[in-house]
Amino acid sequence: YQEALRMESEGINVLKLNTGNPGRFGFKLPNSVRQALALHIDEAVPYCDVRGMAAARNVICTYHIGRGLQGIMPNDVFICNGVSEAASMLLNALIGTGDEILLPSPCYSLWSNNAYLCGGKPVFYRCDPANEWNPDIEDIKSKITDRTKAILVINPNNPTGAVYSKEVLLAIAEIARQHHLVLLADEIYDRLVMDGLRHESIGALAPDVPCVT
């Protein structure tokens, strides 16, 4: 990181594959969001329900029902300060000392760092560059132990940009089903999909498997 900063200071163009910030690449807030913020700024409150504002949770719930999630209610929704806070809260609740979580490789480092902070162990499964960075299903199976608690799926993936097919997601869900694991779905970029591809929500594909998205 320090070396990259030094290179930038010398005018060298550094391509950042670690930056999970679409705003750096020209993606801005939609005008509808900006207008709503400006219109309601005087109604802002310093604190609300610990899970987030009820109106916002209702809208989020409706959005995910429209994406195919079943059985979700507004009380199931927690609004966090980005994926970072969500991951910290989730892993602190889910894993303890020595527990393992399966993470894709390459992976957004937030997840492995939080696993370590919780006393857990990140175990990386391979995403094959020769196969458009898709998860290696057999490698996932081989990494499961009696300490495995969950499988993380980052889709669309950060940093590779891969968008997983329904077949790949169903295969991962089946592994979680067979081994009684929790599915963790980092889908923060679900609408940042290009090239005619379509994002599929793994929670919608496997409603019988515990999933946090």
Q: Which stretches of residues belong to each language-model region?
A:
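N-terminal small-domain helix-loop-helix segment of the aminotransferase-like
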Residues: Y1-G82, M89
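Helix C-cap/helix->beta junction micro-motif
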Residues: E10, C118, Q178-H179, V209
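Conserved PLP-anchoring active-site segment centered on the Schiff-base-forming lysine
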Residues: A93-A115
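A short helix-loop-beta submotif of the ANL/AMP-binding
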Residues: L117-V123
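Active-site phosphate-binding strand-loop segment of PLP-dependent enzymes
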Residues: V123, D128-H199, G203
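Active-site PLP attachment segment
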Residues: A204-T213
